[in-house]
Every structure is written in C-alpha cells, then in structure tokens.
C-alpha cells in the first residue's frame, strides 16, 4: 500500500478489540524502529518505556483520564520520555558527536538561546519520534493512539525512570471493528491542501 493510502487509513483509535493482541515479535520490531528514530544532530534525548505488565498498565490507565478504557484494552502502551538534566545530556549524548556539530550548531543555535530553548528542542526530538512511530505502526498494520491526556506526575512516579520525564504515551493494538472514530464512520477532518501547503 502507498504511504498516502496508509495516511488515509491510520487514525487515533478510540476503541480497541481486546481479543486481538499484538505479538512479542511485533513489540520487538517496534523497539528497534524507535531506536532508529532520527533526531537533530543525532542527539537522541529520549527513552521509551514499553509497558506490557498488566498491573503496571492498569495503574497507568487509572492515571489517564479519558484514555483509561483504551489503555485497558490493549496489551502494549509505550511511554515516551525526554532527558531531564541538560548537563548530563551534554556529557552523555553530545560529547560523542563530531565536535563541529556541537560547536557549529548546538552551542550557537540552541544553547545560546537559553535553557528553556534547550528543553523545548530536546522535547521536539521526542515528538519527532512519535511521528515516526505512528507511521511505523500503520505500515505494520497496527492501530495506535498518541495520548497527551495523561497525568505526567503520576506516570513519572509509577514508571520511575530516573532522569527521564514522561511527555506522552501511545497505545498500540487492533481497533474494534465498530470503533466510532474509524475514518469509515468519522471522515478525516483536515484543513484543505491549499491552506497548509505553499508552493513557490
Ligand atoms: C501529541 C498528540 C496527543 C494526542 N492526545 C490524545 C489523547 O490524549 N487522547 C486521544 O484520544 N487522542 C489524542 N490525540 C489524537 C488526536 O486528537 C488526533 O490525532 C487528531 O484529532 C487527528 O485525528 P486522526 O489522528 O484520527 O487523523 C493526540 C494526538 C497527538 C499528535
């Protein structure tokens, strides 16, 4: 299937079929795909927690507002985290890069604009991996839902990944055949191509 057709088919699934589980092999493939996600100057300021343990998943579901039901119905929840400590990030992630990338890009164009800018830039890299991940799920025939509607403070406490702050989560599974949000029931709503694409 072409990428355009996949883009038309994928959607933020609201109701999953709890009888259809994704396999261990698919989970391992998704882990490898995320590890290969691109990032600015290959900075990789992230961690991805794959939650399959039913007890932990249920605790997280209870901290996920309107997303609770969806999390309870799938066997995989992936939590995307960003590194918290800028100094540690520079030492661990940037010191191994070609020096010119750090002195020619990171220092003058990111760091020079202040700590808030560095943090926002680091988070942007994690969001980029989300787009990559959602496309990979579609390619693998899996349904997925990105979720910012989660209690970040409680997620951090439950997952206890030292030095990493959760940003959002993604459920992965198979949609219920009657899901009201399926594009067959709820056509995709987007601005017109001419409103979002400029051709010069
Ligand atoms: C970063 C991000 C956070 C989102 N958070 C939620 C969420 O918490 N719950 C939910 O049901 N959908 C969530 N969505 C799904 C969007 O509402 C959905 O992608 C958008 O309405 C477009 O619909 P489509 O993905 O089905 O084409 C989120 C999407 C993104 C990209």
Question: Model-predicted segments: where are they?
Answer:
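N-terminal targeting/leader regions
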Residues: 1-20, 26, 33
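C-terminal helix-cap and adjacent tail motif
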Residues: 5-7, 11-15, 167-200
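Short beta->alpha linker loops
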Residues: 22, 55, 150-151
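Small-aliphatic-rich amphipathic alpha-helix that forms the alpha element of a beta-alpha
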Residues: 34-36, 78, 100-101, 106-158, ...
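Glycine-rich phosphate/pyrophosphate-binding beta-alpha loops
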Residues: 38-42
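Short secondary-structure junction motifs
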Residues: 43-46, 142, 167
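Glycine/small-residue-rich phosphate/adenosyl-binding loop
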Residues: 49-124
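A glycine-rich helix N-cap at a beta->alpha junction
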Residues: 68-71, 77-80, 161-181
């Amino acid at each position: 299937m072409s990428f355009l057709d996949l883009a038309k088919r994928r959607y933020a699934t609201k109701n999953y079929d709890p009888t259809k589980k994704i396999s261990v092999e698919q989970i391992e493939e998704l882990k490898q795909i995320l590890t290969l996600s691109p990032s600015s100057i290959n900075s990789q300021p992230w961690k991805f927690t794959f939650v399959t343990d039913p007890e932990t998943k249920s605790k997280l579901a209870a901290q996920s507002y309107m997303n609770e039901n969806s999390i309870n119905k799938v066997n995989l929840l992936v939590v995307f985290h960003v590194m918290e400590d800028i100094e540690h990030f520079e030492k661990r992630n940037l010191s191994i890069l070609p020096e010119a990338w750090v002195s020619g890009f990171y220092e003058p164009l990111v760091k020079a604009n202040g700590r808030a800018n560095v943090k926002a830039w680091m988070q942007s890299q994690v969001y980029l991996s989300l787009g990559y991940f959602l496309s990979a799920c579609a390619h693998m025939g899996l349904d997925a839902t990105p979720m910012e509607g989660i209690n970040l403070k409680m997620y951090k406490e439950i997952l206890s990944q030292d030095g990493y702050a959760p940003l959002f989560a993604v459920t992965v599974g198979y949609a219920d055949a009657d899901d009201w949000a399926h594009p067959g029931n709820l056509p995709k709503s987007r601005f017109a191509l001419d409103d979002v694409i400029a051709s010069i």
